From Swiss-Prot:
InterPro entries for the chain: DEFL
Family of this protein: Belongs to the DEFL family.
Protein's name in the database: Putative defensin-like protein 121
Annotated organism of origin: Arabidopsis thaliana
Record keywords: Antimicrobial, Disulfide bond, Fungicide, Plant defense, Secreted, Signal
GO biological process, one term: defense response to fungus
GO CC annotations, alphabetized: extracellular region
Subcellular location as annotated: Secreted
Signal sequence residues: 1-26
Gene name linked to the record: LCR55
Disulphide bond pairs: C30-C74, C39-C59, C44-C68, C48-C70
Amino acid sequence: MTYKATILAIFMIILVLGIGTKETRGQETCHDLIMKRDCDEATCVNMCQQKWKGSGGSCFQNFNVMSCICNFPCQV
């Protein structure tokens, strides 16, 4: 009886670890450049939240132009 219980316990551990690995997969960060000039922080955040359903955005300097980039979890 203990042999079957040990095999079952090992199987359950592998199953739980496999499920945990599947949930973390696909959580890479994707980026989208929305505005290519004249970035305003509040507008950038609003546009990113509307387009990507709650994901934030930020302004960054792209050469001599302020651009808006959105960061969001990639969908696989």
